[in-house]
């Protein structure tokens, strides 16, 4: 089933998939270096960041994880370690560098996960002889988000940080918006897959950039009692 996916995509999608893998691995290796991990530890962090989301997606779709059939993805994650070693200061220092690589990764992985889910589930439905073979839009968007963010969740857990997806930043919501744009273009009659893909990726990137620049985010959930307790404590101090 995984082979049918690779056969159905164009060379451009394949190139973007490798770009996303490399960018995701860079974002993971960069954080591992800041935590003073050794080479092996840095590689593991880069590996789970770049391939963790796609692995969970494929397991949920009941197909072989993509990197087990295409060893070049594993090599790509190793090249990210080498790149950080060669150009360490440029890749390790600065939040902008991390933002660019991380956002490229989640943008590309979101749409790849969405499209692969559609291809695989509809292929499985046809093979089973089902009358209804269309993949539900919310399933595809959800699987795209899992593909995009789950590797980062594993990365943050491994480096003992609160996963970024659970903090204030627009992360999973930006991916969801990109997936909805993909479907909106499809429903509006945009047949060109390249247009849908590129527009959705750029849309996710733009949302993340605006969120960082203007400090946009999801409100933090806290109980009413906590606010009251903090307010009383402040009054006692004053």
Which sequence ranges carry the predicted segments?
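Short, strongly hydrophobic alpha-helical membrane anchors
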Residues: 1-12, 125-131
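Structural signature of hydrophobic alpha-helical transmembrane segments
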Residues: 8-21, 66-79, 132-148
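C-terminal ends of transmembrane helices
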Residues: 25-35, 58-59, 82-95, 153-164, ...
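Cytoplasmic-side transmembrane-helix entry/capping segments in multi-pass membrane proteins
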Residues: 40-48, 69-75, 95-106, 139, ...
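Short, highly charged, low-complexity non-transmembrane loops/tails of multi-pass membrane proteins
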Residues: 219-238
